[in-house]
Amino acid sequence: MALDKVAPIVIVTPFNVMTDRYDEFIEKVRKALAGTAGAKVGPKPKSKVESPVLDKGTFPVEQPPRWIHVELHGKTQGTTTPKPKVAIRSDDAYIMGFTNSTGRWFQLSKTGTTYKLVDDKAVMAGFDGNYNTLVGGVNNLPTLNLNKFSMAQAAAALWNKASTLSGGIGSDVVDDDDGDMLRANDPVKQAVATLAVAVCEAARFSPVSKVVNAGWIKDKVSVTPDEVNYIKEWGDLSTALLSWMDKQYKDDATIFKKFNGIGITNGEEALAVVRLVKLVIRSNMAAAPTTDEQLLAYAQLPKHGRYMAEVFAVRIPATAGGDRPAAPSLCTAATAAATSFTARKKNTPRSKPAATARVTWSSLGHRLATSAYGPIVFNLDLHDGNCGQADEEEDEKNTGRIVCDAIGGDFSNYNKAISETVLTRCGPAEVIYAVLSNGVQGRVDVKLAGLQSRDEVVLVGRIVARSKLFDFGCVLFYNEAAGVRVRPGELVPLARHALAVPLHMPLTIELDIRHGGSGDEIVRGELEFKTAIDGLHTGRLVGVNDAEFEVTILWSEYPW
């Protein structure tokens, strides 16, 4: 994909690795990365330091607001050594590309990626900048030596990347067909990882820059598990700091409670750690990437997920002046892989007529996300109190069926919301679903973690999961009538747990929970989770009177 325009470039004063002061260099990088809006977190004059907020984010496959170029110099034995540049996004402080000895740009993307970001003639490096790809995971960062000699070696490795080109300087082909797979001691991946920590993570976190600076001229210096914990929590720490600022720098105990385990209990302690605040964009605040170019660009992102299907809703149009179906309605979907789920319609009060019936999904048989490695069949058995009971033959006749041949040669509607209507015994029903080309399973649980009273409480409201890739959300919990009874420490009974989620796009869990009967708010807010191919991610949301809900997501790339 041709690059129409490169974002504005900010050039940091070149850094001579062997002679310049590292601490002064990192301050220059922080200054360059500070967002153009000028926002800073820190209650002046009380706070000793203010942390700048980065530029507002764009999609990973789009140009950032600005590029920050850092040029590395060095001298050994009287000769000038490599002067490569690295390109850092201004919205997330991630390295996205680097130059070699000829000045050619290499983009940190898998071989075959068609979209260009750092330069119109950029060559794909053959791997992305994820720590899983670079060093086997963030927990392996302490294995990196971050002293000045290692940083000089990293610069040399980028400079020597020219040797991997085939077909000459004009070629965009890289001899790295398995470049997205981790290879032991790959010098270029090690170099990118070293610079990512010694430059980017050091700019984000004071503890990282202090560790590197203290060991800059020593034989070996590495981050510790303490710094790794900060790196893991950067997004959530940024969100907490922004929330703290919005609340006039009050309510520290509530806002920073989830970080007590890593030694952060209040805003001042968070500011002492975080020097650059990421402006986290919630999924319901940004438009989904629905243009053909955006979807094509998304399809070019590293594919570590699987083909999966996700259903957002089954809509049943109400007849004019009538009531919507009152009895339970079932919808099942299955593929050749024999994965399935069951949906059960939940009724809303008749005093609140609507154009469509609300459908959520029951967990009956729905233990796994739906595979899309075969044709997907949707069976809708909808009935109301007037339809009566039908025998098996009539049930088969009146069951609406939609078949999506996702493995057919002409199927191309990946990563888009698809709407199809089928005739059922109760009239037409619309199914809205998507087939993902790069999906992972997220198994969601929501727990009432804390309440002022240990007594049972009746919960009403809704819990919705929403991916940034789509305008639609998946209803996990919906109850506006009798409510459900839950005690502190117990799980909220969700209608479904297993979701098929697009990789590389954040997943937001939105909670709007109230007391049954009084309708008083218990908690209202949202938690954003970064999608992953494995691992257990946890987030906490604190509501009125210290009511606390814990959301956990267990990620899996191949759940079947």
Curated annotation (Swiss-Prot):
Active-site residues, as the UniProt record annotates them: E201
EC primary class: hydrolase
Matching Pfam families: DUF6598, RIP
GO MF annotations, alphabetized: rRNA N-glycosylase activity; toxin activity
Family: Belongs to the ribosome-inactivating protein family. Type 1 RIP subfamily.
A biological process term (GO) from this entry: negative regulation of translation
E.C. number(s) listed in UniProt: 3.2.2.22
Keyword Nucleotide-binding found: no
Taxonomic superkingdom: Eukaryota
Stretch list, region Disordered: 37-56
Induction, as annotated: By jasmonate.
Keywords for this protein: Hydrolase, Plant defense, Protein synthesis inhibitor, Toxin
Entry-linked PROSITE patterns: SHIGA_RICIN
Catalyses which reaction(s): Endohydrolysis of the N-glycosidic bond at one specific adenosine on the 28S rRNA
Metal-binding as UniProt keyword: no
Protein name (Swiss-Prot/TrEMBL): 60 kDa jasmonate-induced protein
Stored InterPro entries: DUF6598 (IPR046533), Ribosome-inact_prot_sf (IPR036041), Ribosome_inactivat_prot (IPR001574), Ribosome_inactivat_prot_CS (IPR017988), Ribosome_inactivat_prot_sub1 (IPR016138)
